[in-house]
Amino acid sequence: MGWLPLLLLLVQCSRALGQRSPLNDFQLFRGTELRNLLHTAVPGPWQEDVADAEECARRCGPLLDCRAFHYNMSSHGCQLLPWTQHSLHTQLYHSSLCHLFQKKDYVRTCIMDNGVSYRGTVARTAGGLPCQAWSRRFPNDHKYTPTPKNGLEENFCRNPDGDPRGPWCYTTNRSVRFQSCGIKTCREAVCVLCNGEDYRGEVDVTESGRECQRWDLQHPHSHPFQPEKFLDKDLKDNYCRNPDGSERPWCYTTDPNVEREFCDLPSCGPNLPPTVKGSKSQRRNKGKALNCFRGKGEDYRGTTNTTSAGVPCQRWDAQSPHQHRFVPEKYACKDLRENFCRNPDGSEAPWCFTSRPGLRMAFCHQIPRCTEELVPEGCYHGSGEQYRGSVSKTRKGVQCQHWSSETPHKPQFTPTSAPQAGLEANFCRNPDGDSHGPWCYTLDPDILFDYCALQRCDDDQPPSILDPPDQVVFEKCGKRVDKSNKLRVVGGHPGNSPWTVSLRNRQGQHFCGGSLVKEQWVLTARQCIWSCHEPLTGYEVWLGTINQNPQPGEANLQRVPVAKAVCGPAGSQLVLLKLERPVILNHHVALICLPPEQYVVPPGTKCEIAGWGESIGTSNNTVLHVASMNVISNQECNTKYRGHIQESEICTQGLVVPVGACEGDYGGPLACYTHDCWVLQGLIIPNRVCARPRWPAIFTRVSVFVDWINKVMQLE
């Protein structure tokens, strides 16, 4: 080999080694501080103005008397620690300023390779014998002298001679000189169940032996799986995980030339150990749903085999028209039978590859969600203002807060402020005349209020919605700058709808639309949101752009995280999303007006829908499209739908050409021009077929639920 190829090889190797982060040797405990309770134990001084946590790790790593460090996120300070959480007299505390990093060798409960680097605190052999202290020569004499470098502390199991069986110790039994401690390798310690989505082991190398890249770093490979966005995926340190529903756990590697690889982990097999039998995967698969789906639909096992746009699904065991990795044999526990809608990768809802070459995959949003509501425990008349029963739990089973209590929520309505409302104990009541029935504040700190486990009495018919009011005045909403009068989604054209938002999942992908009804509130469809109770960490709304995939740094783009979701009244199919901060209103981002309560849009009114959804080949769906539609009466709509259209729904005229809402548009607005303003009269929900010619499109009528919308925005 000549000197030039050798030089190039050395440069390449040095680059590969240079991509390894010193943080790879540490376990991270976010928002945690480690204190030693002894006054005589003093940590190292704070070293301020450190570049980042990697610099702290670089300082701590080679020091034998540094086993952990604090990193102050605010001051970028670093404090080296001579102890870990397993040291005597130490205790972990929550911290709003610090992250704790501890050397893996000191806190791992398993060993890598033969455990020469193991520095844990196991002090008993596999046979149950206590270990002899390394500093003692009785009852068993030996040649080892404890030093800071060899780590022969106390009577902890160690492997100073590289025994292939792993750490061992001399015993306190004269007849048994030494014995293995039986500490499992990290590979053996935890097996993989199903495809390993719930794997939480501590293996940090791939099957080829490459070291894994930390999930919280973006070098050498940038990626979307940021731990703070994927809290449920346990993306700790650089351990093998499966956040995207791959065939088995994997990781990004520290080799710049190899982005990601699978990890070599044992399968649990058919005879599951007791510790695995209660895993999340198996609990999630109990009571598989056939006619509806829960959460994200990972347990859905029904036979729906078309998308919400009516496109037939491709068989999972076929690779045409679309090639894919979800081969049924490799995903045995995902039930990838025939061409049924499934969710093998933890997407937002059940989906499938489609039989249309130009459309790779689509959701099956037409599958209903399983009801989460309790069987009603009583009934009420009218709107329930006179209800004086003793039901004291919400429709989801959450206990009500006492009306006189201020914990966990400070109530607007109390026995003192509303003496005629019967606000006794924590019984469900309706002090504000809510048209959707009795409600209560809840004992859940994250749920301010909800409607109760009650239903309208059978002999009580709800009043019909009112006629349109004579005078309607709107201010500071529903205004836009139209560059063209030709604003005409399927069959639509690129248009301007500054209140239409794009909902983005944790990987930044568009999956639904929504409408900006207040600076910090977005209205969307229940079918788009997988949970109204669990945090939607990592989900965002994007505003101010007509591009589905805007370029980084696009001037008018606003990206705002979703703080929480509030589910609408029963049958509404609505969800309000509260944003972490208010958006900035301008020509590109505007509020849409809400209609008056119970407002009925006159037949013939021209409205428009907007979205980035599937256009079934009629146009380019990478930009926002707007399509015009005329409202028809519910009576006319029911002639097509055989009387199934309710007053809480609104219809638009079916056209000969396919114009309507499709995959990706759901949750977006049906906006009608009323009194010189654009008003949110309807919300796009999944229909039986996408943009079916000559069939009316159905929307949720927003005016029926506008009192709930205003109530949530006021109370929250």
From Swiss-Prot:
Q: What's this protein's name? A: Hepatocyte growth factor-like protein
**Can you state the subunit structure given in the record?**
Dimer of an alpha chain and a beta chain linked by a disulfide bond. Interacts (via beta chain) with MST1R (via SEMA domain).
Report the sequence similarity comment from the record. Answer: Belongs to the peptidase S1 family. Plasminogen subfamily.
The encoding gene: Mst1
Residue stretches in coiled coil: none
Q: List the disulfide bonds.
A: C56-C78, C60-C66, C110-C186, C131-C169, C157-C181, C191-C268, C194-C333, C212-C251, C240-C263, C292-C370, C313-C352, C341-C364, C379-C457, C400-C440, C428-C452, C477-C593, C512-C528, C607-C672, C637-C651, C662-C690
Describe the location of the PAN domain by residue ranges.
19-105
Give any GO molecular function from the UniProt entry: serine-type endopeptidase activity
- List the source organism: Mus musculus (Mouse)
